[in-house]
């Protein structure tokens, strides 16, 4: 598949004796069709081949010249004995393939709804917070370097305790500018089981309510922020595994297409894995739930304005709830239902795409105005989870929540707390109270003031009419973290996971700078571009070499740092030293980066 697409326009011949084969027992069919990962096919002009080979050798990247273009519109694999186990006209492969007609029927699935009582709120919340979709991802984020490139403007962990709570990731475009790129994810597998169309819409909605916290760059042709976002859809589906699955996929794709068209969004790329089922010799079949994972990406106008989900412990501020869905609060397809062993059939969706876009653009405008102090999306786990997560990364403080003004047909506290209708919670200073009220009213956006911070209490107190309940933040933080500990325990040794679980909240970030420190070159009388000036100073610069090996990272930002400090910087690989291409004779300092 990889090599054939490279020569689609001209044809080509692959010499199978030149392919790196690790298992000599593989048949020709297995060699041609295997899906070994971490490989890349390149089509290179013959005159540049030696240059590319030298680069590959320097970087220790295994490179194999396995074939050539032919110009005869045929694509073939040739064995050492001259036999061609594969030889087709490229037109047969790409140009004239017949359309696949898939016939299916609609199969109605009705899943039992949930029954519950407000007397078990603590038990419900404890179980919801431990489900993997909601629980802490510390076990995962601790396994990656979150600073490589030196351009990471928004990484996973947030707040004093540095918990993985970020809604989106943001990377700067360069070391000195304000622009960047944001990305976020969304998926709704449980909702997709109950209603494939609603699951697709919720996946898109979650991805957008995650990326909304980064100020999206706009232009004259696309003045609304939401129009400047691109999506990627990864379809994970058990096609042809049972009656009705292909129909569900069709409905899901149609719903996503319609929703994105209504929002003015582009989905230029994606991926699919449409055979997610496994049948065993005894006839048993395991079928994965069909879902779509939506990735959103956009240019960021100012990486310094990205909103954090961590609540600011300012008693003179308020938290506002904004519902993007324009739908009734429903528990079908929610984590709450899953926690009770149910799925439910009453699934929320986005009733009015135009209103959703208006809400998104309104939040973007508030970010540009600088009015939002903190913000978080409402998705897995519902409103109560979003509010708790806004407090988890703090060592002190809580909030008082009043649900009285949330519009609903009934006074169902459980729905208010656990429904996963797309929406957001924002924190705004009380001095902007009148401004925010006028802004939302002028833009036709419904909003509800639901909470205010309580800096002296580590509780979330929820009230509605005669109902009142306290949730202990410290206890629930440990509950939320427990799943991460249990997963990490399987992957680490010597009780390190237990130590992490015991101490993670006892080491908050507490950074103190000298009063004179401003974090700018200007404050030291320095100009970042001073080395470009033609004043002869560049000839006096000492030389530093960054020694790297395959797997080294962090070398690019180190090179920039050294250059900024006044060094000429050389990139030196171990192969340079071994081959004698580099002797380090003119080097004054060497640096080894991690990897």
What are these language model-derived features?
Residues 7-10, 33-45, 232, 237-269, ...:
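Glycine-rich and small/hydrophobic secondary-structure elements
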Residues 46-177, 189-192, 216-218, 249-251, ...:
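Intein/HINT protein-splicing elements and their conserved insertion hotspots or analogous self-processing inserts
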Residues 175-184, 220-229, 585-592:
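Short coil-to-beta-strand
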Residues 193-278:
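A glycine-rich phosphate/pyrophosphate-binding beta-strand-loop-alpha-helix module
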Residues 541-562:
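Glycine-rich phosphate/diphosphate-binding loop of Rossmann-like nucleotide-binding domains
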Residues 561-564, 569-595:
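Flexible gly/pro-rich beta->alpha loop and the following alpha-helix that scaffold active-site loops
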């Amino acid at each position: 598949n990889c090599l054939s697409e490279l020569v689609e326009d001209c044809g080509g011949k692959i010499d199978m004796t030149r392919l790196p084969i690790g298992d000599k027992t593989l048949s020709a069919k297995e060699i041609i069709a295997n899906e070994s990962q971490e490989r890349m096919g390149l089509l290179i002009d013959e005159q540049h081949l030696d240059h590319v080979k030298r680069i590959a050798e320097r970087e220790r990247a295994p490179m194999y010249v396995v074939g050539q273009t032919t110009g005869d519109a045929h694509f073939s694999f040739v064995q050492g004995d001259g036999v061609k186990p594969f030889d087709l006209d490229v037109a047969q492969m790409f140009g004239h393939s017949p359309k696949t007609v898939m016939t299916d029927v609609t199969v109605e699935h009705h899943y039992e709804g949930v029954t519950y009582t407000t007397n078990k709120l603590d038990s419900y919340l404890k179980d919801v917070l431990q489900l993997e979709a909601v629980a802490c991802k510390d076990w995962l984020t601790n396994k990656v370097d979150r600073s490589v490139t030196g351009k990471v403007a928004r990484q996973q962990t947030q707040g004093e305790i540095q918990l993985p709570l970020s809604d989106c990731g943001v990377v700067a475009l360069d070391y000195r500018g304000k622009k960047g790129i944001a990305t976020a994810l969304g998926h709704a597998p449980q909702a997709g089981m109950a209603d494939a169309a609603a699951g697709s819409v919720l996946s898109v909605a979650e991805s957008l309510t995650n990326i909304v916290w980064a100020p999206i760059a706009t232009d004259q042709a696309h003045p609304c922020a939401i129009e400047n976002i691109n999506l990627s859809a990864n379809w994970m589906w058990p096609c042809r595994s049972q009656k009705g699955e292909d129909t569900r996929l069709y409905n899901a794709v149609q719903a996503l297409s319609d929703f994105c068209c209504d929002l003015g969004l582009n989905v230029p790329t994606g991926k699919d894995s449409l055979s997610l089922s496994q049948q065993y010799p005894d006839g048993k079949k395991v079928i994965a739930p069909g879902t779509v994972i939506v990735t959103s990406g956009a240019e960021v106008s100012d990486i310094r304005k990205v909103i954090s989900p961590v609540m600011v412990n300012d008693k003179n501020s308020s938290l506002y709830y904004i519902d993007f869905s324009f739908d009734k609060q429903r528990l079908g397809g929610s984590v709450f239902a899953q926690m009770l062993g149910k799925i439910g059939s009453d699934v929320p969706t986005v009733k009015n795409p135009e209103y959703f876009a208006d809400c998104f653009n309104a939040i973007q405008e508030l970010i540009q105005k600088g009015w939002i102090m903190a913000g978080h999306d409402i998705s897995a786990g519902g409103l109560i989870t979003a509010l708790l997560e806004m407090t988890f990364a703090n060592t002190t403080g809580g909030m008082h929540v009043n649900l009285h003004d949330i519009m609903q047909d009934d006074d169902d506290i459980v729905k208010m707390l656990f429904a996963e209708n797309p929406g957001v919670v924002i924190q705004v200073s009380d001095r902007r109270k009148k401004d925010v009220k006028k802004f939302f009213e002028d833009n036709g956006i419904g909003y509800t003031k639901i909470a205010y911070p309580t800096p002296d209490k580590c509780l979330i107190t929820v009230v509605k009419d005669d109902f009142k309940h306290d949730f202990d933040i410290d206890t629930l933080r440990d509950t939320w973290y427990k799943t991460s500990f249990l997963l990490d325990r399987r992957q680490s040794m010597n009780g390190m996971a237990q130590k992490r679980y015991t101490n993670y909240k006892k080491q908050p970030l507490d950074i103190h700078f000298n009063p004179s420190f401003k974090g700018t070159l200007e404050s030291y009388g320095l100009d970042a571009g001073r080395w470009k000036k033609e004043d002869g100073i560049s000839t006096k610069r000492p030389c530093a070499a960054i020694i790297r090996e395959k797997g080294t990272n962090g070398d690019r930002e180190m090179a920039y740092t050294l250059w900024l400090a006044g060094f000429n910087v050389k990139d030196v690989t171990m192969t340079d030293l071994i081959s004698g291409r580099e002797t380090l004779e003119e080097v004054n300092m060497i640096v080894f980066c991690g990897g």
